[in-house]
Every structure is written in structure tokens, then in C-alpha cells.
Regions:
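Charged, amphipathic alpha-helical linker segments immediately N-terminal to NTP-binding catalytic cores
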Residues: 5-51
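N-terminal signal-anchor transmembrane helix
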Residues: 54-76, 105-109, 114-115
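Hydrophobic/aromatic beta-strand patches that form the interior of the parallel beta-sheet core
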Residues: 74, 98, 230-232
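Glycine-rich phosphate-binding P-loop
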Residues: 76-93
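Short His-Asn-centered micro-motif
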Residues: 77-79, 209-213, 235
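Post-Walker A helix-loop "phosphate-sensing" segment adjacent to the P-loop in P-loop NTPases
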Residues: 93-103
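PAPS-dependent sulfation machinery
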Residues: 104-208
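Conserved phosphate-donor/acceptor-positioning beta-strand/loop module used by diverse small-molecule
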Residues: 211, 222-247
């Protein structure tokens, strides 16, 4: 029998706000003893960040709310394992675009400061690459915004991975618009608008470049939020996508 792997201590829900954390926590009860270390560390991270979340809100709230989104955003969409990450990494080299970094996506509520302690911890605890394809990752590399949506309390495909016992429910409610309630749609709209205004403000008005396979079926909703949004749909041979997806899972 294979030895059970020790759980990852750096869990993304540690980047939530205090209220969002407890909502996620109690909505997905019960948990196993196996996950206790990562749950405790996540709670410590959330509690430790309360002052920085509060002061960032006070300092930047008005500027973020008044930030205009003139162009875009641009969304890279397509099925998982179709090359969205590679295309995102390539296009993010263009200075006319701004992207959300790994650290900012994980901690969207307090990401405008220097985040020195959090970034230092991420460098120590994060793997150097994504295990399934060896793509390099780090606190400052481009990342998809789905982490931020989950941390902001919106619907998010990543909750399928955070809470796998409810994978079918979370997949349907985060990917298929017809399965979303009006409340879930509004939470997604609110989170996207807040995040895009904040990232546009943080990047001096540059057009945001997002990458998110889950948005392939959200395009009509995203057009309601951002009338000037543009989409880049990348397609890969399905006979290559399928085995790649099997390897991923």
C-alpha cells in the first residue's frame, strides 16, 4: 500500500479575508484530521493578514472604486491543457498588458503592499514548478485569476479542488451559467469588477490580460460586466488534450 503523502501546508484559502474564510470553512464541513495542519496554518495566515487587509481597504478604496476600465480585459480561454498557460506567459511579455501575479491572485484583498513576509514564505513553501508539466511558478509569475475569485468569496472552479467531496456541485455552479443562481452570478460579477479595477489601478491603467479555462463558458456574462472585453480562444487537438487531462488528474 502506498504511503500517504503529507498534506500541502500552503493552502490557497489562507489568502481569503476573515469573513470569507469562515464562510468557506463552515459551508464545507466536516473535515478529516489529515487536513488539520493546513487548516490551522490557513487560519493563522488569515488572522495575521487582518491589519493589512483593513489598511489597504482604507487607503485605496476610493481610488479603486473610481478606476476606469477603458480597454479590455483580454481573456485567454480554452479547454484545460490546451496551452492557455503558455499563451498567457507569452502575451504577458508585452508591456501594453498587465497580468495578475501568483501572489496577488492568492491574496487579492491585501496585494497592493510589498507583502514581504507573505512573499518570502511563498518562495520557501511553493514548488519551483507545476508538477504536471514542469512550468515554472513563483510569487511574481503570471497566474489565472480564479484563485482571486475564490478568495473574494465568489463562485470559483478551484473550489472543486479545495473541497473535492462537492466537486460536481462546485463544477456546475462555477462553469455552467445555466446552473448558477442569480446570487452566484452577481457575486461573480462583483468579484470580477472589483479585481479588474484593483489590478488596473495597480498597473497604472494598463489593459488586463487574464487566462482562465473556466471562463470559456462564461463569456456572455463577462461581456455584461465588460462590454469592451476581448477573447482569445486557443484550441488543441482533442486527442492530445484528453491524455493530458488524464495525466493531470
Amino acid at each position: 500500500m502506498a504511503k500517504r503523502k503529507f498534506p500541502d501546508l500552503l493552502h490557497p484559502i489562507g489568502g481569503c479575508g476573515f469573513i470569507q474564510f469562515w464562510k468557506l470553512y463552515f459551508n464545507n464541513w466536516p473535515y478529516t484530521l489529515y487536513s488539520l495542519p493546513s487548516r490551522l496554518l490557513s487560519l493563522m495566515a488569515v488572522t495575521f493578514r487582518i491589519p493589512s487587509v483593513f489598511f489597504e481597504k482604507i487607503r485605496h478604496k476610493n481610488a479603486i472604486n473610481s478606476q476606469e476600465i477603458k480597454d479590455g480585459p483580454i481573456f485567454i480561454v480554452g479547454h484545460w491543457r490546451s496551452g492557455t498557460t503558455h499563451l498567457h506567459n507569452l502575451l504577458s511579455q508585452d508591456d501594453q498588458f498587465a497580468f495578475i501575479t501568483f501572489s496577488r491572485s492568492l491574496m487579492p484583498l491585501d496585494c497592493l503592499g510589498k507583502l514581504r513576509p507573505a512573499r518570502a514564505l511563498m518562495k520557501i513553501m511553493m514548488p519551483k514548478n507545476r508538477g504536471m508539466d514542469k512550468v515554472a511558478i513563483g510569487p511574481d509569475t503570471p497566474q489565472e485569476e480564479e484563485f482571486a475569485l475564490a478568495a473574494l468569496g465568489s463562485v470559483s472552479f478551484l473550489k472543486c479542488l479545495y473541497f473535492p467531496r462537492r466537486i460536481e456541485e462546485y463544477f456546475s455552479s462555477s462553469v455552467f451559467l445555466k446552473c448558477m443562481s442569480e446570487q452566484e452570478k452577481e457575486s461573480l460579477k462583483s468579484a470580477y469588477l472589483y479585481l479588474t479595477k484593483k489590478m488596473t489601478y495597480a498597473n497604472n491603467g494598463k489593459t488586463m490580460l487574464y487566462k482562465n479555462p473556466a471562463c470559456t463558458s462564461r463569456m456572455s456574462l463577462l461581456k455584461e460586466i465588460f462590454p469592451n472585453a476581448k477573447f482569445v480562444h486557443i484550441v488543441r487537438n482533442p486527442f492530445e488534450v484528453f491524455p493530458s487531462m488524464m495525466k493531470l488528474w
